[in-house]
């Protein structure tokens, strides 16, 4: 774009008769352009001009008699003076000669001249401050001789850099004030003139004045007001609805100030045409955008303005034979607006590329309209206009030059669009196609292949099938013309040309609509496959349509199946498939595959049953669907974020072989074990089972349990068939539950192939029953007192029996106290409601502290009992026919529904009502989940009815409960309990001495009267197989109290097995008095175990 279009600078002239300006130029360049000029508009708002360029013009360019808009704002006269004689003889006459030229009114226009003359006195000595004229300084002398002209000092030599900066800062402020003052005066003058003109009907003069206002605002960079003035000009022009000729397009287009005439002047001359009007407003609007800060918004605005101008001219002058030439030169001119070094901004690259593409397409249209040259697949609308393109003849002197210029232009545009950060990928592909078609047209087939390789795939994938098909046909033809091209480089990998060609044939089959064309390309595809046997992956969509029935069912024992509807419409005939696979993936990333082999896929609709022998249960999302035909794998990959999921349930089948893993029913206290049971094991030929412990979610670093006590073992394998296996494990963390992954692989005797199952099993490893024990010693009897409670507050326990067995090594113990319930007892967590079970143990021989007894407790949790009752009594209700339908879903019922039920145990305990807690289960979600299964309606309905009943509450009696839970297998906990270690043990008895009357019944005991008793102390160590100690090592003592006075042998040594002595007890209180306490200690003062038979007896004293 020509430089003259940029007019945003304030003109300032200088007259330099002494050739001083060049020494001052660096100083002026330091302060220019002026910055931060504040102008207060008439409405009171303050506008800030951040940057105001100043154009310094030698006085020679300002000598002519000009109007205000052509005159400088300031006129400088630069002089110096070092003596009185020089001032009087040369300087003063020169100033007086210069001043008469500064007329107040233009002689040619009669317009008042508004500018400011300033004398610049150049001095690098003290002459300015010295009094050359005795009483006044040189500056004062200038002021006295020329009072109406401002005189300013300028210099180029300073005492310091700081002085220099301060001096020119002050000078800059004075120039700002002068420029602002002249701007304000000119603005006021023009506005007054316009106001006066609006009173009359002189439209042309009003228009001229508005144009001057616009120019003044532009010069001073007040762009908002300039834009408003331009809009007013346009509004006035349109309002007058002037008749004007079309005019001629300016070829070549000029945007210089010489061609940018005043609109008012043109109207006065009567030469205005439509082209001049379009150009006038375009140039001025573009000028305003040019003066704005060089932001992306300004560039986008300029680009839109240029496009709109081209569109307007194209419509207005569509019949002009010079239209294409005009557009070419116009766009060339406008491209200079976007010339920057090292352009890297994507938006600027995009704008420039768009303009270049407009220029190229216009040029191609001009060439094709005026010559016989053609480009493949490049067409323009037919036109009756015989366009001229003579000025650009050298760009297409022959077809080779034409194609080379087209290629150069396209590559330049392509390079710019490639810098747009992928925003214009479609245009990049289109341009690449055009280059490829040019190569193909020039029989440069290898170059064409390299370009088309990615382009046609883009169009077929974006459903631009018509374009994709054409390019594809050209690509195949180009590749067919390259017999030596065996390998192509695609994304850095080497791919055989045959594979690429096979892929292209499939693309053709996808895009072809008529069957005849499909047959031709299908034959070519089959011939190529027969010759090369290519293996590749290809998208399934476009050739097949897949619809899934998301409900998985059991095809036969150990085989799950899913139904698929497959429509084949991409091939002209039936095709034989080798394999079809549907892959599903769960949240953990595990994949299961349903498949079918050797299936004849008919053209049109097909219904398939895909089977899975290596099954896994849970919720799965669709991963992919594959069909293998003639070595080609057609794949449909499903998106990761999808709402649809497929539930693979565990369906029960009597004939199915599987391995069940659960917590062992019979456990010893402190022991942890699993039970592995092989179902239908007699049908197995081989069996491999892997039990793997999963890390807990709360502690992913460590394993919760190990299968070895000596080392951490997370995996256990079995490689031979079995019926039942007990697998012990050891806790490594404080947990109540953990997860196992059970992987089973097996073959059957009467069925070919390998079967497998992978399932996740949750093991509850906490003990549901809490057992504590106390021991009680008596003279000839020993008691165990067991207290039983539920170990978890939320999980009551049902107790069936409690039996204590003697050690296997002895049979002379007599045990009494076994508990066998007629109606199971309900045990809770509450310690105040413990179930107490006492056992009386006597020994024919001695007790042995090494002997270990076993308490065997048979129990279930209340939830297990209620689950059983709900299943048998509420759900099945003895309906055999319905149970046959339900049986295959009983595993799903147990794992997915029963496990989630939470009962109101308080309601059951108090009123024998089975009812679910409100937070137990969401019936709507459960209903929705069940409907995703291929479950029969009769089964579904009854399950929902059952859940509704239990949600409301069901009253039961003990008889019904006992009857329906007979099939519930009790758990058994064996608690080993050992007799306490040997301690010295004594039996003490107060035996009343014989009198003529029974002292306790026939005589009245009164306070102060003694009562006679024989105290018998027996050492019972013999009952524990220990020798009696007779060395006096134990001391017997009757303890004093405030109730009794002891008379007799109160304290003595125990030296024999049995000792008897007499004491007299004198009561000191009335009422019921307990016998005195006794104590036996060893010589170290430690108390021994004593069985005091009178400890809880009392005597009534009167």
From Swiss-Prot:
<dbReference type="GO" id="GO:0016236">
    <property type="term" value="P:macroautophagy"/>
</dbReference>
<dbReference type="GO" id="GO:0006891">
    <property type="term" value="P:intra-Golgi vesicle-mediated transport"/>
</dbReference>
<dbReference type="GO" id="GO:0005829">
    <property type="term" value="C:cytosol"/>
</dbReference>
<dbReference type="InterPro" id="IPR056913">
    <property type="entry name" value="TRAPPC10/Trs130_N"/>
</dbReference>
<keyword id="KW-0333">Golgi apparatus</keyword>
<dbReference type="InterPro" id="IPR056916">
    <property type="entry name" value="NTS_TR130"/>
</dbReference>
<dbReference type="InterPro" id="IPR045126">
    <property type="entry name" value="TRAPPC10/Trs130"/>
</dbReference>
<dbReference type="Pfam" id="PF12584">
    <property type="entry name" value="TRAPPC10"/>
</dbReference>
<dbReference type="GO" id="GO:1990071">
    <property type="term" value="C:TRAPPII protein complex"/>
</dbReference>
<keyword id="KW-0813">Transport</keyword>
<comment type="subunit">
    <text>Part of the multisubunit TRAPP (transport protein particle) II complex composed of BET3, BET5, TRS20, TRS23, TRS31, TRS33, TRS65, TRS120 and TRS130. Interacts with YPT31 and YPT32.</text>
</comment>
<dbReference type="GO" id="GO:0034498">
    <property type="term" value="P:early endosome to Golgi transport"/>
</dbReference>
<dbReference type="Pfam" id="PF23036">
    <property type="entry name" value="TRAPPC10_1st"/>
</dbReference>
<dbReference type="GO" id="GO:0042147">
    <property type="term" value="P:retrograde transport, endosome to Golgi"/>
</dbReference>
<keyword id="KW-0072">Autophagy</keyword>
<protein>
    <recommendedName>
        <fullName>Trafficking protein particle complex II-specific subunit 130</fullName>
    </recommendedName>
</protein>
<dbReference type="InterPro" id="IPR022233">
    <property type="entry name" value="TRAPP_II_complex_TRAPPC10_C"/>
</dbReference>
<dbReference type="GO" id="GO:0005802">
    <property type="term" value="C:trans-Golgi network"/>
</dbReference>
<dbReference type="Pfam" id="PF24966">
    <property type="entry name" value="Ig_TR130_2nd"/>
</dbReference>
<dbReference type="GO" id="GO:0032258">
    <property type="term" value="P:cytoplasm to vacuole targeting by the Cvt pathway"/>
</dbReference>
<dbReference type="Pfam" id="PF24967">
    <property type="entry name" value="NTS_TR130"/>
</dbReference>
<comment type="similarity">
    <text>Belongs to the TMEM1 family.</text>
</comment>
<comment type="function">
    <text>Specific subunit of the TRAPP II complex, a highly conserved vesicle tethering complex that functions in the late Golgi as a guanine nucleotide exchange factor (GEF) for the Golgi YPT1 GTPase. TRS130 plays a role in the YPT GEF activity of TRAPP II in concert with the two other TRAPP II-specific subunits TRS65 and TRS120. Required for both the cytoplasm-to-vacuole targeting (Cvt) pathway and starvation-induced autophagy through its role in ATG8 and ATG9 trafficking.</text>
</comment>
<dbReference type="InterPro" id="IPR056915">
    <property type="entry name" value="Ig_TR130_2nd"/>
</dbReference>
<dbReference type="GO" id="GO:0005769">
    <property type="term" value="C:early endosome"/>
</dbReference>
